[in-house]
Amino acid sequence: MESKALLLLALAVWLQSLTASRGGVAAADQRRDFIDIESKFALRTPEDTAEDTCHLIPGVAESVATCHFNHSSKTFMVIHGWTVTGMYESWVPKLVAALYKREPDSNVIVVDWLSRAQQHYPVSAGYTKLVGQDVARFINWMEEEFNYPLDNVHLLGYSLGAHAAGIAGSLTNKKVNRITGLDPAGPNFEYAEAPSRLSPDDADFVDVLHTFTRGSPGRSIGIQKPVGHVDIYPNGGTFQPGCNIGEAIRVIAERGLGDVDQLVKCSHERSIHLFIDSLLNEENPSKAYRCSSKEAFEKGLCLSCRKNRCNNLGYEINKVRAKRSSKMYLKTRSQMPYKVFHYQVKIHFSGTESETHTNQAFEISLYGTVAESENIPFTLPEVSTNKTYSFLIYTEVDIGELLMLKLKWKSDSYFSWSDWWSSPGFAIQKIRVKAGETQKKVIFCSREKVSHLQKGKAPAVFVKCHDKSLNKKSG
């Protein structure tokens, strides 16, 4: 009897060891399946947003528990771009911190492909395919191993990282929820086919910020063509406020040459800071407007919110999936918070004598129930008698309900005999203003029956004579 019990005990121990060894072999096999993945996946914490202290290792389930991955929350995967130094840029911990501030229970993973990103640009651009494959295999493993829903996954890629995110999204077993492209790189990608770059098919929703598209297609730092469901071009997508040459000279004079590299990529990196702004200032999202071109936007012709023609920039964007990519525009401030308030102004210039002037400088001042914004400069390429002109202006402060405006026609910076002999002028009865953010239209009337606007003279004053509030479905 005793020998039988010992035999059963020995059999149990043998079976247990066999099961354990098989489990170990299976785990080892799974690790080998991912041994060629070079990218690293660091789960950063709200307490330490700057350091990669814990890595999620594909094929090693214990690493997910060790890093305290939250299986019931959203996951953000931040993918950096090309690097000269081989180190993370200063924006990475800022974005991580902003994501955790907005979504405290989320997982923020930083994808480290620094060794590949530090090569000559064409080489690093080619590596985006391998990085995308690495990210896709990691995501697929998380879904298969832990049944983690891909509807909780949001990829954020900057520059080359945006295309790596797109390639990853195209290779996952199921579509991830969202990809945000932060000024996707232009060189090597402007004319690339969709499978080799970020495209609308790579996620349930793809939104893109274009902030440095200056130059000919294929040569601009950021990609020019739309590559998402919604493509937003702040300030036309070329240069960003505060990133101009004059600003560069001023900063170099104040801080020395150490910040030159920051100024070179200032507009490119602005895409990241605009997104960070949307995370931190959720109560006041910047509004972008769909438009056929930046020239039409500059004329104020696109401040409509009908049929999804306007949208929020950044995290709280409305996920509109149109058949064609939607190009949207907005103005911003030069620093955070970036939000401004857009207005379309329409003026009819009347007169008894035919006059035409080119490149005329004006100033307009707006006065509202909350604040005022004075001496806003604008230039009209042409001003002719008995013609109506539309243009865009914006204020950096919310002035509330519009009550009054002043319009001044500025003198030329050079001496003009014709202006000295007889000051040019136009008659203006009404000025129409539409506020983009509130969608309200206001008509301003001259304090007299007609205001006579003369070049270089006192501004003409107009007060609200009629307004018409419009809801979001109106024009």
Swiss-Prot record:
Q: What compartments host this protein? A: Cell membrane; Secreted; Secreted, Extracellular space, Extracellular matrix
> What are the BP-aspect GO terms?
chylomicron remodeling; fatty acid metabolic process; response to glucose; triglyceride catabolic process; very-low-density lipoprotein particle remodeling
Q: Known PROSITE patterns for this protein?
A: LIPASE_SER, PLAT
Keyword Mitochondrion listed: no
Is this entry keyworded Signal?
yes
**Residues covered by region (Important for heparin binding):** 430-434
Which residues does the annotated region (Interaction with GPIHBP1) include?
32-53, 443-467
Membrane topology recorded in Swiss-Prot or TrEMBL: Peripheral membrane protein
Q: Enumerate the spans annotated as PLAT domain.
A: 341-464
Q: Where does Ca(2+) bind?
A: A194, R197, S199, D202
Q: What is the designated name of this protein?
A: Lipoprotein lipase
Gene name, please?
Answer: LPL
